[in-house]
Amino acid sequence: FLSLIPAAISAVSALADHF
């Protein structure tokens, strides 16, 4: 489960950087 956290963070960072 913890391995999903960095992926989620990078996804949110990508969305935040896109907007």
UniProtKB/Swiss-Prot annotation:
GO cellular component, one term: extracellular region
Record has Cell inner membrane as a keyword: no
Major localization listed first in the record, in broad terms: secreted
Cell location: Secreted
List of residues that carry Phenylalanine amide: 19
Assigned keywords, A-Z: Amidation, Amphibian defense peptide, Antimicrobial, Secreted
S-S bonds: none
Coiled-coil blocks: none
Keyword Secreted: yes
Tissues expressing this chain: Expressed by the skin glands.
A GO BP entry: defense response
Function as written in the Swiss-Prot or TrEMBL entry: Has antimicrobial activity.
Family: Belongs to the frog skin active peptide (FSAP) family. Phylloseptin subfamily.
Protein name according to UniProt: Phylloseptin-Az6
Gene symbol of the encoding locus: psn14
